[in-house]
UniProtKB/Swiss-Prot annotation:
Protein name: Conotoxin ar3f
Family statement: Belongs to the conotoxin M superfamily.
Tissues in which the UniProt entry reports expression: Expressed by the venom duct.
Record organism: Conus araneosus (Cobweb cone)
Lineage, top ranks: Eukaryota, Metazoa, Spiralia, Lophotrochozoa, Mollusca
Cystine connections: 2-16, 3-12, 8-15
Length: 16
């Protein structure tokens, strides 16, 4: 699952 990264200007995601 990939979750949004708070504070990323382009709404990037990280797989957690």
């Amino acid at each position: 699952d990939c979750c949004p990264i708070a504070g990323c200007p382009f709404g990037c995601t990280i797989c957690c």
